[in-house]
């Protein structure tokens, strides 16, 4: 029986050595036949050492005792996944006693509980300068195969964005599969969607069995989020795409000839970290070139961050990993996915808007945003708070808070917060309201989100909302009219979205995060036929394309652009691609003014490196950046050494023992060869000078003499040595040092920002500088 269990769990041939962690799993899996265990169970991510021999497995197996196999208190551990590519280890549901046994077994490194991560929930390609048949989108630059793996809610394979017309056969290097499942056949894949897998064991261990009346236990997308991100990154060109006539035009992914591999690890209530790791692990094994992750959790140390650890494994295999920054802005230090080997993407505006004019009874006009395209509403009475419902939640229009006798036929005012935006509209409609005015709070500022509401609705910024509420407070019979203007172009853009999470990074403050901004507000892309555009079950509408917002939408823009760069520069490392995207980013808008920040105090405030990183992505310039900052696995490991990580914690990333260099004690985390600079100064401390070293690689003109230009952060003197970098050949590497001298301490915590640029002919290699006083 011993041998049967061993072969059933871990089959192997005589000429294939077993990994040590597999022997470790067999050992703890079977050793519990000999002991009683406590009944409380929880799912864990477990990291183990990566050494292996079949002899160890056999010797452990032969040492087992099973005399208590029939004990009534016996509880079998549940092993969900074995991780071999993204990390070394496995996930399992264990009792407390079983976890203790695992911790005391040779080869164990660490364990932490599974958790649910959150999703960070088209014309944008044209706004970024990508047009069919021109420049980067001509046939020459699109000739090679690049595979984008998206970890999300799945995909809708029949969607028009995923046609494989004129695509070449699937690359022979592809090792993935198209897994069967509920309402998903292997025949659903084609030359565009070349891989499909679903991961739900971790989710079900936390939440319970998936409700297959509302979701599919397969890669099929029941929510729409995964279809939206996949079509944004790599969707085919679709003419006349629109949302009920709005935003009509050409829809396309950033790299429309790329292949797609869909890994469904996100379900109705979120994404279990164990499932996300399993999806990344499979993507690495399958052979993707880019991994796109529009999801994340709260910021935490990298050694307990599943995306940071699994993303490191992908980076080691030369895979570019793009992650959303999160939707917790504009509060500072909310950015997630901040590991330096990940590309962290903030959300920005395009110049496309959906204006609606609200004219209130005192003849003032307020400008909002709406996807409704019906007839105007004229002189309807307004209802708000106590004039709309008797419950305290009426101010937010939460479920069952409004009274029909108070709101029927009226325009209802709802404040943002406490419930979903489209759910507020559902409550207004349920209560007989004619329309909704959704007012931003001070925290949300002037953000104008165009949501797919179930009734006529207008989003208003904080200032106009305040004007509206002041009018309402002083009017006996307040009324309003609304005129819907459809789709408009030419608004000031780009601009950082207020909801986009901000730096500095809590886990790694010496690395400026986020890295880059990309379109993430009111983005049109493909949608699932099994989900309403509002995500409300009461909404019977079905659409081919939907308009939604979030850093979730920004992330696949960068994933697709990274694939585009990879198709032109197949030998570039993930760090080189990241550097090219960052150092060529735009910092001015379409009015030639500094890119603004919707979440900052003051309507004209310029965005900083903690809002948009290096700037807004410019794909055309990114393909020819001149210089790049390359970073190796060893560089990243030395960075972890500089964080004073123990050898055990570094082992989580390296997979094998890594000895920190003797000079690591004098290295700063800021010495990582990164395309931006984060300088941290402590008020009142003796440390007034910080010095960083950088090395750049010439990927532009073989001979070029770069001159440095510095715009100093307020309160800091910046010195660069040398001031000139003379390159004589392609791929030559030259180094420089930057010294930051604080002029004086600050009285409180604050930040100031500057820029360092290397200039030669057409090249402007720009790196942002962020200085923080603590």
Curated annotation (Swiss-Prot):
Residues 379-472 form the PA domain. GO terms for molecular function: serine-type endopeptidase activity. Residues 122-623 form the Peptidase S8 domain. The active site is at 152 (charge relay system), 225 (charge relay system), 552 (charge relay system). InterPro entries: PA_domain, Peptidase_S8/S53_dom, Peptidase_S8/S53_dom_sf, Peptidase_S8_Asp-AS, Peptidase_S8_Ser-AS, Peptidase_S8_subtilisin-rel, Peptidases_S8_3, S8pro/Inhibitor_I9. The keyword Hydrolase applies. Residues 1-39 form the signal peptide. Glycans are attached at residues 36, 138, 183, 211, 385, 477, 644, 657, 747. Induction: By auxin-rich callus induction medium (CIM) in root explants followed by a transfer onto cytokinin-containing shoot induction medium (SIM). Serine protease that cleaves the phytosulfokines PSK3, PSK2 and PSK5 in vitro. Phytosulfokines are plant growth factors or peptide hormones that promotes plant cell differentiation, organogenesis and somatic embryogenesis as well as cell proliferation. This is Subtilisin-like protease SBT1.1. It comes from Arabidopsis thaliana.
């Amino acid at each position: 029986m011993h041998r049967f269990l061993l072969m059933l769990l871990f089959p192997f041939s005589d000429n294939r050595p077993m990994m040590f962690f597999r022997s470790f799993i067999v050992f703890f899996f079977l050793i519990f036949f000999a002991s009683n265990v406590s009944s409380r169970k929880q799912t864990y991510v477990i990291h183990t050492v990566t050494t292996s021999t079949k002899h160890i497995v056999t010797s452990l197996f032969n040492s087992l005792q099973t005399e208590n196999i029939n004990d009534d208190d016996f509880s079998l551990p549940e092993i969900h996944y074995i991780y071999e590519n993204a990390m070394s280890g496995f996930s399992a549901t264990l009792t407390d006693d079983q976890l203790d046994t695992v911790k005391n077994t040779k080869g164990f490194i660490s364990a932490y509980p599974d958790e649910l991560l959150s999703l960070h929930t088209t014309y944008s390609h044209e706004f970024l300068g990508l047009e069919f048949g021109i420049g980067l989108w001509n046939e020459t630059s699109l000739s090679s195969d690049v595979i984008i793996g998206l970890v999300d809610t799945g995909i809708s394979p029949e969607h028009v964005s995923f046609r494989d017309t004129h695509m070449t056969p699937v690359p022979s290097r592809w090792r993935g599969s198209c897994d069967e499942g509920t309402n998903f056949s292997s025949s659903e894949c084609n030359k565009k969607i070349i891989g499909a897998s679903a991961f739900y064991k971790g989710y079900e261990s936390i939440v319970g069995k998936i409700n297959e009346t509302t979701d599919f236990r397969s890669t099929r997308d029941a929510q729409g989020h995964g279809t939206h991100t996949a079509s944004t990154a790599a969707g085919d060109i679709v003419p006349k795409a629109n949302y009920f006539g709005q935003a009509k035009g050409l829809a396309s992914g950033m790299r429309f000839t790329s292949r797609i591999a869909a890994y469904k690890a996100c379900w109705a209530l979120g994404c279990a970290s164990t499932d996300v790791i399993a999806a990344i692990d499979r993507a690495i094994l399958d052979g993707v070139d880019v991994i796109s992750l529009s999801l994340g959790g709260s910021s935490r140390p990298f050694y307990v961050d599943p995306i940071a650890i699994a993303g490191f494994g992908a980076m080691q295999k030369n895979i570019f990993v793009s992650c959303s920054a999160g939707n917790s802005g504009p509060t500072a230090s909310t950015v997630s996915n901040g590991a330096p080997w990940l590309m962290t993407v903030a959300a920005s505006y395009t110049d496309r808007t959906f204006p609606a004019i609200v004219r209130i009874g005192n003849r003032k006009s307020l400008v909002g945003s709406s996807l409704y395209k019906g007839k105007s509403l004229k002189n309807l009475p307004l209802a708000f708070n106590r004039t709309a419902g008797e419950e305290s939640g009426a101010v937010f229009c939460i479920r069952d808070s409004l009274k029909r006798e108070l709101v029927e036929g009226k325009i209802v005012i709802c404040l943002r917060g406490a419930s979903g935006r489209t759910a507020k509209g559902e409550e207004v409609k349920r209560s007989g309201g004619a329309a909704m005015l959704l007012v931003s709070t001070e925290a949300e500022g002037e953000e104008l989100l165009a949501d797919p509401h179930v009734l006529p609705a207008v989003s208003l910024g904080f200032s106009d909302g305040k004007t509206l509420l002041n009018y309402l407070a002083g009017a006996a019979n307040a009324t309003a009219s609304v005129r819907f203007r459809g789709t408009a172009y030419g608004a000031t853009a780009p601009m950082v979205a207020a909801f986009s999470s901000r730096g500095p990074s809590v886990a790694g403050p010496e690395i400026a995060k986020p890295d880059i901004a990309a379109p993430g507000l009111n983005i049109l892309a493909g949608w699932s036929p099994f989900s309403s555009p509002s995500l409300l079950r009461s909404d019977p509408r079905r659409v081919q394309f939907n308009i939604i917002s979030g850093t979730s939408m920004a992330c696949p823009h960068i994933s697709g652009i990274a694939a585009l760069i990879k198709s032109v520069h197949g030998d570039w490392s993930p760090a080189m691609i990241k550097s090219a995207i960052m150092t060529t980013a735009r910092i001015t808008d379409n009015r030639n003014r500094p890119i603004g920040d919707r979440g900052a105090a003051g309507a004209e405030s310029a965005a900083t490196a903690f809002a948009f990183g290096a700037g807004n992505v410019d794909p055309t310039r990114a393909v020819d950046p001149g210089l790049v900052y390359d970073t190796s696995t060893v560089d990243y490991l030395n960075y972890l050494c500089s964080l004073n990580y123990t050898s055990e914690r570094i082992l989580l990333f390296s997979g094998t023992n890594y000895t920190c260099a003797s000079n690591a004690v004098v290295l700063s985390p800021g010495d990582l060869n990164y395309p931006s600079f984060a300088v941290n100064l402590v008020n009142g401390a003796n440390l007034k000078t910080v010095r960083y070293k950088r090395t750049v690689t010439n990927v532009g003109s073989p001979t070029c003499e770069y001159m440095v230009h510095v715009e100093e952060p307020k309160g800091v003197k910046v010195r660069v040595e040398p001031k000139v970098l003379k390159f004589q050949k392609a791929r030559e590497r030259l180094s420089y040092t930057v010294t930051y001298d604080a002029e004086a301490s600050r009285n409180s915590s604050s930040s100031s920002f500057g820029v360092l640029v290397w200039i030669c002919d057409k090249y402007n290699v720009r790196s942002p500088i962020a200085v923080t006083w603590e």
